[in-house]
C-alpha cells in the first residue's frame, strides 16, 4: 500500500474537525491527527463540537487540548446546542456553522 502524505514540517496544513458530540472527533479522527503530528506535520487545527454543556464541555476542551499537543495553532470551540434536540435546532445549527465558515479556511 502506498502512503499518503498530508502535511510536512515545511508546509502548514489547516485541518477542520467537526463533531456533533464531545468525543466524536477523538473517535473518528483522533488516530489520524496523532499520526500526522507524530510524523512531523505542521498543523493548524480548528476543532468544532456542536454540544458540550457544563462538565461535558470542560471534558471536551481538556480532551481536545490533549489531542492537539504539538499543533502549532489549535482553535477549539465547543457550542452548547442540546444534543437531544438537534433536529429541532436545525436553523440555529446551520447559522452557527455558517458563522464558523466565515472564519475558517481549511485545506
Give names to the regions the model predicted.
Residues 2-22, 26-107:
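Active-site beta-strand->loop->alpha-helix modules in alpha/beta enzyme cores, enriched
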Amino acid at each position: 500500500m502506498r502512503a499518503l502524505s498530508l502535511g510536512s514540517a515545511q508546509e502548514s496544513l489547516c485541518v477542520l474537525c467537526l463533531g456533533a458530540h464531545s468525543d466524536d472527533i477523538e473517535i473518528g479522527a483522533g488516530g489520524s491527527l496523532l499520526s500526522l503530528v507524530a510524523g512531523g506535520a505542521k498543523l493548524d487545527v480548528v476543532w468544532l463540537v456542536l454540544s458540550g454543556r457544563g462538565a461535558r464541555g470542560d471534558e471536551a476542551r481538556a480532551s481536545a487540548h490533549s489531542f492537539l499537543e504539538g499543533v502549532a495553532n489549535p482553535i477549539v470551540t465547543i457550542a452548547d446546542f442540546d444534543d437531544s434536540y438537534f433536529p429541532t435546532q436545525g436553523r440555529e445549527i446551520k447559522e452557527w456553522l455558517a458563522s464558523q465558515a466565515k472564519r475558517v479556511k481549511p485545506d
